[in-house]
Amino acid sequence: MSKFNRIHLVVLDSVGIGAAPDANNFVNAGVPDGASDTLGHISKTVGLNVPNMAKIGLGNIPRETPLKTVAAESNPTGYATKLEEVSLGKDTMTGHWEIMGLNITEPFDTFWNGFPEEILTKIEEFSGRKVIRETNKPYSGTAVIYDFGPRQMETGELIIYTSADPVLQIAAHEDIIPLDELYRICEYARSITLERPALLGRIIARPYVGEPGNFTRTANRRDLAVSPFSPTVLDKLNEAGIDTYAVGKINDIFNGAGINHDMGHNKSNSHGIDTLLKTMGLAEFEKGFSFTNLVDFDALYGHRRNAHGYRDCLHEFDERLPEIIAAMRENDLLLITADHGNDPTYAGTDHTREYIPLLAYSPAFKGNGLIPVGHFADISATVADNFGVETAMIGESFLDKLV
């Protein structure tokens, strides 16, 4: 018999809580990640007011320096800790896959100097469109459309760029390159990047609208991932007949593997929370697992190094957290975590190698406190333990700590 009938896992994309022990092995614009601290630096530089997460225990998570504006609770309503990543990567897919029990020992390919000419030529031949060679490098997604969007509007050329992550991104103005065509080109790019020397984690369609100087990326983003190389706990749940619900880009990240209810993409964090609430309210969702990703922290503010916007985004989530708690049933468990860091005060524009926070809350809790510091995959091990299925590759359950 399951301890909790339903578990809801919410990933606050990129909300790290301090540099991981191996952070100096990872860099941003040539600067090691060893001094990165997403929540710590936001709290210190622009202030952070998240009383609802604080009540569960966010300020109680052990740190060398306590969060400046998030106090520890003497009697929190839940459990808290921080988790370390063991996989060799700091990208979204690696983080989520490890959360679901995989250890990625061979990282995907990254292209600091741009993609090989062979890749670009194949895409040109397939699409019938030229590729702007000047964008073929790690580039900020907002900067690349600012710099080359006007040219694309004139010529119809493709904007292809990458980042420190193993991704190939194609930006296209929706009035110039229709969504169906963009998605078709991305599907082709996915088909030619499934093995080395160009094994990529994701192909990302990045549509945008607007006029030169005032371009805006739309919610029609599409991620084309590869399937996990080994069964995750999602697969184990699915095989056991336990419902799995995906909210936001979760279905894309796992390429649909182990997910039997895709609730769709999010237009924003607020829309994602609305979808989660709708999912939690489904009469047929009596037992199972929901998995939500809220990406605005990362996509809108982390990469753009906008600490004020990031803080406000955290405030907005915290203000809606009581709605999520109110939608819980007596034997539900809520887990709030992240997948990597993206310190908006740090060098560069890419992710930072950090611990992730973990907050656990249930109306059924009679106790509270700290869970021992562990690893990302402990989350999936706990989910597996609760529902009586096998774990994946790694992870240790903390289910017995939740009382």
UniProtKB/Swiss-Prot annotation:
Pathway: Carbohydrate degradation; 2-deoxy-D-ribose 1-phosphate degradation; D-glyceraldehyde 3-phosphate and acetaldehyde from 2-deoxy-alpha-D-ribose 1-phosphate: step 1/2. HAMAP family: Phosphopentomut (MF_00740). Phosphorylated. InterPro entries: Alkaline_phosphatase_core_sf, DeoB, Metalloenzyme, Phosphopentomutase_DeoB_cap_sf. Mn(2+) 1 binds at residues 13, 339-340. Binds 2 manganese ions. It holds the Pfam family Metalloenzyme. Gene3D superfamilies: Alkaline Phosphatase, subunit A, Phosphopentomutase. One of its GO terms (molecular function) is manganese ion binding. This is Phosphopentomutase. It is found in: Cytoplasm. Mn(2+) 2 binds at residues 298, 303, 351. It comes from Streptococcus pneumoniae (strain ATCC BAA-255 / R6). Its EC number is 5.4.2.7. Keywords: Cytoplasm, Isomerase, Manganese, Metal-binding, Phosphoprotein. Belongs to the phosphopentomutase family. GO terms for cellular component: cytosol. NCBIfam families: deoB, PRK05362.1. Isomerase that catalyzes the conversion of deoxy-ribose 1-phosphate (dRib-1-P) and ribose 1-phosphate (Rib-1-P) to deoxy-ribose 5-phosphate (dRib-5-P) and ribose 5-phosphate (Rib-5-P), respectively.
